């Protein structure tokens, strides 16, 4: 009786392992079943699920749309092997945003590649298609404001870091667009590349950059770091007691945008 009730409501997804070769952050090592395993899981899930889905993830900040077509092709191989057409296909996340050294193709090219891959499945009726836009949807909506606590030549020690909102600037080495908040003082037109160091005791609290800022930046200056609407607030910890929960809503434009043909070229890194 319990199994019958579950059968009426249960939605199961089998996550398929696909290549993350074009992603800045590889998410393929922990999750995902190879094609032969996924086929067996799909057959098993068919016995119990009300809705059955296949999903994949091409990795975070995917820089080439072809990855989605390749993922859909793997889905097609599983469908051919099992003769089971899923109710849902989830093409996952990975949709990119723009950073100074990472300029993706227009978002429409990603959608075109997905549609092409789905068409190549040659199914009489397509399943429901879902996706998980993250960075591409919300990255531009948030910034972090940091204070320069100390300058040592081209090293800036700031009051946030990899244990705070700037995790992606650490190990993945994402370079955020940056600009000094002038606050009434004269800012040099000469630019210099800087490394950042966070406030904690850990030497890993380091952000290589390069972060391009005016040469005359000094202690107590404030810097805006953009593209932190995704994975900024969610990564904060209270390690060493450093934690900021001050959030303000403003209505100015983002430092960079991928949804405007006139991209702000002064923030791009060659």
Please identify what each model-predicted range represents.
Residues 4-7, 23, 46-48, 90, ...:
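Solvent-exposed alpha-helices and their adjacent loops that cap or buttress functional pockets
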């Amino acid at each position: 009786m319990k199994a019958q009730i579950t059968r009426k409501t249960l939605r199961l997804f089998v996550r398929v392992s696909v290549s993350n070769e074009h992603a800045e952050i590889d998410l393929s090592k922990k999750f995902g079943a190879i094609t032969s395993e996924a086929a067996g899981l799909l057959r098993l899930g068919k016995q119990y699920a009300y809705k059955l889905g296949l999903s994949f993830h091409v990795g975070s900040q995917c820089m080439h749309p072809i990855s989605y077509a390749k993922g859909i092709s793997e889905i097609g191989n599983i469908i051919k092997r099992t003769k089971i057409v899923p109710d849902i296909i989830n093409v996952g996340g990975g949709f990119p945003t723009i950073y100074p050294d990472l300029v993706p193709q227009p978002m429409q090219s990603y959608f075109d590649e997905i549609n092409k891959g789905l068409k190549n499945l040659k199914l009489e009726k397509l399943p429901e298609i879902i996706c998980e836009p993250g960075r591409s949807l919300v990255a531009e909506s948030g910034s972090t404001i940091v204070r320069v606590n100390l300058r040592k030549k081209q090293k800036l020690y700031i009051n946030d870091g990899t244990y705070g909102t700037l995790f992606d600037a650490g190990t993945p080495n994402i370079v955020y667009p940056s600009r000094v908040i002038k606050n009434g003082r004269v800012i040099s037109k000469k630019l210099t590349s800087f490394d950042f160091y966070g406030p904690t005791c850990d030497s890993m609290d380091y952000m290589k950059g390069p972060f391009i800022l005016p040469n005359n930046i000094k202690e107590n200056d404030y810097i805006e770091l953009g593209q932190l609407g995704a994975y900024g607030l969610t990564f904060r910890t209270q390690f060493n007691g450093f934690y900021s929960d001050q959030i303000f809503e403003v209505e100015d434009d983002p430092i960079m945008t991928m949804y405007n043909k006139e991209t702000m070229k002064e923030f791009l890194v060659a």
